[in-house]
């Protein structure tokens, strides 16, 4: 599924799908946004932020935010657009993220959610001296996970097909 098809799908749902990118020192920082526009007012319902390195395992997902009262399929559009963008525009074929230890019990929910999306656990990042570099990159401790871009995109495509949206 291509970005252009996802943008058309978003439009059919009354939404706007945008991808912003900037390059700094060989890193491509990106932001995927799903919003709704009414007259001159834009409401951002959700976004994904991250960066890419120029290799197959280079997609790094940093922030996923979806508002609680958002319309249906916001997170699915964000995931699909992020994976489609990476596959179309970068050499990245897998994504990495950290389910950060924020609140008691919330980390387990994040890990469960990311597993449903198609991610698997690489390792627990904690207070071990060997984890210092990863803690600096991700800004904390948590569960480091990886997922394959094609399979995550396919999961979203199957969901859209089941809802007769594509």
Segments (PLM) and residue ranges:
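Non-catalytic substrate-recognition and accessory regions of acyl/acetyltransferase enzymes
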Residues: 1-73, 80-99, 103, 107-120, ...
């Amino acid at each position: 599924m291509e970005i252009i098809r996802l943008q058309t799908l978003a439009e059919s749902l009354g939404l706007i799908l945008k991808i912003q990118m900037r390059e700094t020192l060989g890193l491509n920082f990106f932001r995927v946004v799903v919003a709704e526009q009414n007259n001159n007012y834009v409401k951002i319902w959700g976004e994904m932020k991250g960066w890419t390195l120029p290799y197959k395992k280079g997609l790094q997902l940093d922030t996923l935010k979806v508002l609680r009262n958002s319309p249906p399929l916001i997170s699915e559009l964000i995931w699909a657009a992020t994976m489609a963008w990476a596959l179309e525009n970068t050499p990245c074929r897998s994504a990495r993220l950290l389910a950060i230890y924020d609140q008691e019990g919330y980390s387990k929910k994040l890990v469960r959610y990311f597993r449903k999306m198609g991610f698997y656990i690489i390792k627990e990042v904690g207070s071990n001296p060997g984890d210092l570099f990863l803690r600096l990159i991700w800004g904390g401790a948590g569960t480091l996970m990886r997922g394959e871009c094609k399979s995550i995109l396919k999961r979203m495509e199957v969901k859209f097909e089941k809802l007769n949206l594509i």
